[in-house]
């Protein structure tokens, strides 16, 4: 009573993923296709998706564009830039956009032919005006990406998660930090945990927000050699909330 809207104490958790997470791989393939379409034809309307499993990449959808796009080349280039050196096969099923749909979205004053419901807010607890947990999870994922590209035993797939503790509506401490990273088979979990704690977590987390009770969970499930599309099947749009 007297505390207003806020619960006396609660925890808020957010996650992020690296570019090598297979969901984000699919997003990046679709984004790169859209970028190429808009580069050639600024009036392009693209509804192209990607799905990946093991060595198969499926690119499919509808395209309303005058651009000439090499879908296979773009998909394979994305995989290479992310850091996956396995051999992939690309199956493309992209048709010309329906004239009925194209006619409904082709007017200059209309920028979209569908609808959605979104919500969001600015939060002054960080410089980015985002809640602490999500912005810190993103920073950890970005740092993990940087360290991975300089560390031979780290591989592209990864996920981060931050749980923040609030008391009377105010951020008080970080309760839990989770970092899961794919790696090669020739490294111990102790080496991985030391690397991630010193090179990823410590440079990102404000030391004033951690204490002796803060939990650091680095590869909590143990070995993470099989990752990317070989460990999961994924598709575009699954990380919209994370984004």
What are these regions (language model features)?
Residues 1-6:
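Short, Lys/Arg-enriched N-terminal segments with co-localized hydrophobic residues
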Residues 7-47, 52-53:
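N-terminal, positively charged regions that mediate nucleic acid binding
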Residues 13-17, 73, 77-80, 84-229:
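Glycine-rich, mobile lid/loop segments that gate access to catalytic sites or pores
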Residues 18, 22-26, 68, 129, ...:
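Alpha-helix N-cap/helix-initiation motif
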Residues 21, 38, 237-243:
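Electropositive polyanion-binding surfaces
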Residues 45, 157-159, 213, 237-241:
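Short glycine-rich loop/turn motifs
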Residues 47-65:
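Short, charge-patterned binding micro-sites
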Residues 62-69, 223-240:
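Short glycine/threonine-rich loop-to-helix capping motif typified by GTGT followed
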